[in-house]
């Protein structure tokens, strides 16, 4: 991959969400000094409709050429417009298997995926998204479903809970250094208090650890994820950072509690799921 501080791997298909994911990756790369690779896996069963082996091979080759041409056109267009180099590759195969093999081989710092409009309520139940959250220990950037950031320069950063805000992940620290806007911290309190107006810390000892932070506290209860999502949109966040649980209680867990999952599902803001490091 390109020689840069970070390496972004953008997973695409032929959906609009893939285009949004690539644009978000480009905007992020400009700010944090990252190289970009685009990877596209297409299942053969989407192409093959013949029993004759020769016909199958011919069809696969035609589809490979057509798919690579379409991908090259998309990547080259964005690369030329944004003046940033992008490398890309394409293959046929099982989507999850090929992606896992490619991640193992290239070791990207951030995997970037689009957010499809879910047929069901839970977007995070999507096969690839769920697989990555369970198995990939690095950062995952989930692009907004219908939102493309104009720039990550001076981006408005939001954090879901204190552990996300205080996380020492390097990419988050780099983004913090490149913004002058107050951070937004969204917390769900296990109390009977009402939703508070946004407040800022005023005590010196608190300022030293979480200075320049606006806090939104929500009562745990009915529709708290709706309330959080509403305030995320209202504050025009550019990126929401979410920390996975260090020790997952279940082997099948994606490392996000129910409230975090619901909030991600209901917001269009790009979400950076932070590395699951012990």
Task: Outline where the language-model segments fall.
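Small/aliphatic-rich secondary-structure junction motif
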Residues: 2-55, 154-218, 237-239, 266, ...
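Rossmann-fold cofactor-recognition segment
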Residues: 85-88
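Short, structured interface segments
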Residues: 129-147
């Amino acid at each position: 991959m390109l020689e840069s501080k970070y390496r972004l791997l953008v997973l695409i298909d032929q959906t609009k969400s893939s285009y949004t994911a690539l644009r978000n990756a480009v905007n992020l790369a400009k700010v944090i000094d990252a190289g970009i690779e685009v990877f596209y896996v297409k299942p053969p069963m989407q192409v093959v409709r013949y029993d004759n082996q020769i016909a199958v091979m011919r069809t696969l080759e035609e589809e490979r050429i057509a798919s690579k041409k379409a991908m090259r056109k998309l990547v080259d267009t964005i690369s030329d417009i944004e003046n940033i180099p992008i490398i890309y590759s394409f293959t046929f195969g099982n989507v999850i298997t090929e992606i896992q093999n490619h991640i193992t081989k290239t070791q990207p710092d951030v995997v970037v995926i689009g957010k499809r409009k879910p047929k069901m309520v839970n977007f995070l139940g999507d096969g690839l998204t769920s697989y990555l959250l369970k198995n990939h220990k690095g950062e995952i950037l989930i692009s907004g479903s219908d939102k493309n950031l104009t720039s990550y320069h001076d981006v408005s950063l939001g954090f879901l809970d204190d552990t996300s805000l205080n996380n020492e992940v390097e990419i988050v620290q780099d983004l913090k250094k490149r913004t002058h806007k107050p951070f937004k911290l969204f917390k769900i309190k296990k109390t009977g208090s009402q939703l508070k107006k946004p407040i800022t810390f005023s005590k010196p000892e608190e300022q030293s650890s979480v200075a320049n932070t606006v806090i939104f506290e929500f009562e745990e209860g009915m529709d708290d994820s709706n309330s959080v999502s509403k305030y995320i949109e209202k504050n025009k966040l550019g990126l929401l950072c979410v920390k996975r649980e260090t020790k997952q209680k279940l082997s099948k867990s994606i490392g996000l509690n129910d409230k975090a999952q619901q909030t991600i599902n209901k917001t269009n803001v790009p979400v950076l799921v932070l590395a699951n490091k012990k």
